[in-house]
Amino acid sequence: MKKLDGLYLIILAAAIVLQISLGDIPADFFAFPVNAAILAALACALAVLYREKPSLAFARWLASGRTSILMLSTLALACIILGLVTQRPEDSFAGLRNIKATWWFVDILLWLIANLIAVLLTRKFRLRFFLNHAGLALALSGMMLGSPDESSEAMAVYRADTGSGMTMTSFKAEYSPNGMPSGYEARLRIDGRDVTIKVNHPYARTVFDDVYLVDYDRSRPEPAYCIVETVHQPWKSVIWLGIVMMMLGAVLLFAQGVSTNKEKEGRI
């Protein structure tokens, strides 16, 4: 088992070297249908492995709790770096400023997804266990494999209708003592609906499209326009399905714990 732990770390190191040598993964490298094919091939390969050779050392290692901890630890470390280092789509050492597009981050997530699938294939079915692990696998798959299919478009929204389906009806900004904007919000009419959007509080235009407020006309006291960015996420439903499954799994886990405690108290 320890040798395979070492192999996992060696492959991770190789992915880091690959990142340093080649740079970020091309934006469309994992785009549909390649991402869906990779996920399906991974699931099928693991299903065959655990049906035909479940006693192999690699198969036992991949489905073990020890391996889950190892992979979650490396993912947690990557997420800490992600939170501490400002992310920009620019060249940086080992991709530290654009982690989601690095070879080594994709390597970590693919291994973790494989581990979750392996655990599901080798454990006795329990609904709460299935919901938690399958939900996490779906959420990770949607976030990682679905990111190449994401697209965004920024545009200026004026008070007059320009044929985009969006017009600005009012704008409000708050300023700090040094004169810099501390927050702002725009009242927009989108597809016939009056909505208010703020920074980091997008409007869900469709199931797959979110409209973000990113900037505004700073050349005059009363802005003539604001700038919004529409982000299209085709895999958003997969991510939300995974999140909902994990929430249901957590509720069942809590309910099971309460039921178990009551049974113990009844025996005393």
Where are the language model's segments positioned?
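Solvent-exposed, non-transmembrane regions of integral membrane proteins
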Residues: 1-268
